[in-house]
């Protein structure tokens, strides 16, 4: 039992080191990724297109998002050696906008009305990160 705890602690520390601070932006990204996956599954059920293969590919894509955050963090701290995390922050904002728009698309496919203000905010973030 203790070995499992140590391994999990080691993995958690390594991941935390690679992705940088577990700050509000990173937590928001985790939340958006989880909500996008859940709404994607709900949409697939609603449209009767649920597929374990598509779901597995979706999970792999979500993992790649966090790999790219880690790459951006390494660029910031070990290649560019800049204060703060401008590259990491930009990558997180890009994926926040991307995941947010995907969430809206998934929910809209369920015939749920989407507040225009929310759509505009996410589209503006997306434009700013392009």
Descriptions of predicted regions:
Residues 1-6, 96-130:
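Membrane-proximal cytosolic segments adjacent to transmembrane helices
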Residues 16, 29-39, 65-73, 94-102:
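Alpha-helical transmembrane segments of multi-pass membrane proteins
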Residues 38-48, 100-108:
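Juxtamembrane membrane-interface segments at transmembrane alpha-helix termini
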Residues 47-67:
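Juxtamembrane helix-capping/reentrant segments at transmembrane boundaries
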Residues 78-106:
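Hydrophobic alpha-helical transmembrane segments and immediately flanking/interface helices
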Residues 8-27:
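Membrane-helix boundary elements
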Residues 24-38, 53-59:
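Loop-to-helix transition at the N-terminal end of transmembrane alpha-helices
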Residues 1-9, 63-67:
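Short hydrophobic alpha-helical membrane-embedded segments
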């Amino acid at each position: 039992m203790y070995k499992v705890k140590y391994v999990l602690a080691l993995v958690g520390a390594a991941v935390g080191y690679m992705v940088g601070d577990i700050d509000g932006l990173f937590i928001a990204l985790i939340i958006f990724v989880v909500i996008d996956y859940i709404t994607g599954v709900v949409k697939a059920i609603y449209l009767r297109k649920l597929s374990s293969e598509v779901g597995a590919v979706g999970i792999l894509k979500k993992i790649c998002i966090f790999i790219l955050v880690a790459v951006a963090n390494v660029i910031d701290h070990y290649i560019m050696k800049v204060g703060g995390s401008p590259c990491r922050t930009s990558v997180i904002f890009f994926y926040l906008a991307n995941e947010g728009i995907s969430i809206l698309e998934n929910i809209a496919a369920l015939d749920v009305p989407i507040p225009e203000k929310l759509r505009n905010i996410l589209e503006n973030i997306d434009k700013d990160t392009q």
